[in-house]
Amino acid sequence: MQSVRQTVLFESEEAWRAGAEQNATAITVHARGGEVVQTRRTWAAAGGPRVRVTWSGGRTVSEVSPQLAAGLSVYVEGGAHVSRDFVQARGQAVFHSAQLELDAVRAWWPRELAVQPEALRWAECAYDIELGRQVRVDEYCALRAGETVALTAAAGGTDEAKVETGVFYPEISDGADVSLSGFRCTWLRDGSGRTDTCQKTLLMYKPAHVHMPEPAVGIELVQPVTLHPVIEVDLSSVSASGPACAHHVFLQLPAQLFVDKFQQPPELLFGEDDLELPEYKVEAWGSEVIYALEPGRVNRVQLHSRYARPGPGRRYEVVPLRPYVFEACDTGSADIAENPFYSKGMGFEAYFTADTVFKHRNSTRLNIPVPRGNSNDFPSIQYVTVLSILFSVLYISYCLFRRPVAASARASG
């Protein structure tokens, strides 16, 4: 049986009072823009390996959502029985793609479920999905200004489904504690579509992910961009929040890019680290890298481009990359691991302790141009090469045969 929980998070009490209406059959939300709707669907499953699938277009962190890596990421606990596309990391195997690849999701999705990956709203929303003994699909959608959404019992899909809806605003959100105030309703399971009970609700918990936009942290690509791109992370105006805190940058590098662990040793590096292989010889999707950053200064991360297989037309391939700059703080609190809306698990969170709070500073998208040979130039390159070889042979022959003639002329004189 499916259970569905819908949560709407307003930015303030004022927006909550003005934007939420409730009657016997629906909760209607009138958005000002920026409201987050989390829909959690849960089913029992036959079992299998524990897998986490995430999909995001950028920044997702809020009081009810963690920070998900941009693009598609698939994490398999233990890392056994995965294809060569995966990277073996600490306690997990990882697959990543900047684009949505539904085949990578279908490979782990239970076939018996009524809802299949094609039915999800990939183009509009972010997803945090857990597969295994149960299937849990957390959908995060941001509402646009002027958008109106009606939340009803129909979200359950069937009359037997358990449906719960909550509408909240943050009463306290200071980075250490979150207190959400609002109301929540349950729905009758008799096909009437009417609410069962509604009650005021106060939720208090400690978040594992916090958005920290101030002080500003800049992420830039040093110009001009060469075969060895350099990323600058400006932490000049930033200091550590405490003795148990440290700043890091997390990178998911596609096959076109890599780091030299000998030139600039990272804290963690999983995946393709061969310094000589061209892109088309790399088997896995790329690598995951974490570097320690020093607050109070501009930090540089040195990348390198792999030689790419030539193709028609393009002289450069633009590779998107989104570095995640965050401060990781050990708290000593067991309450950090999970809260009513998300729990820490696989992903970059697995590289830190269970009591770590992630304070996210910036995640600017960078577009890195990687040189790629133009196969349309092959005929002209071959023509010039042949001419150069012929000219070289003629010139060398001329020099070899000219010297004896000149010497004999001097001798006869």
Swiss-Prot record:
User: Where are glycans found on this sequence?
Assistant: 362
A GO CC annotation recorded here is: glycosylphosphatidylinositol-mannosyltransferase I complex
One Gene Ontology biological process: GPI anchor biosynthetic process
- Extract the signal peptide range: none
Q: Where are the transmembrane segments?
A: 379-401
Query: Which residue spans belong to the Lumenal compartment?
Result: 1-378
Q: Which segments sit on the Cytoplasmic face?
A: 402-413
Q: Assign the protein's first listed, main location to one coarse class.
A: endoplasmic reticulum
Copy the pathway line from the protein's UniProt record: Glycolipid biosynthesis; glycosylphosphatidylinositol-anchor biosynthesis
Q: Which family does it belong to?
A: Belongs to the PIGX family.
* Job description of the protein: Required for proper folding and/or the stability of a subset of proteins in the endoplasmic reticulum. Component of glycosylphosphatidylinositol-mannosyltransferase 1 which transfers the first of the 4 mannoses in the GPI-anchor precursors during GPI-anchor biosynthesis. Probably acts by stabilizing the mannosyltransferase GPI14.
Q: What is this protein called?
A: Protein PBN1
Taxonomic source organism: Eremothecium gossypii (strain ATCC 10895 / CBS 109.51 / FGSC 9923 / NRRL Y-1056)
Name the lineage: Eukaryota, Fungi, Dikarya, Ascomycota, Saccharomycotina
The encoding gene is PBN1
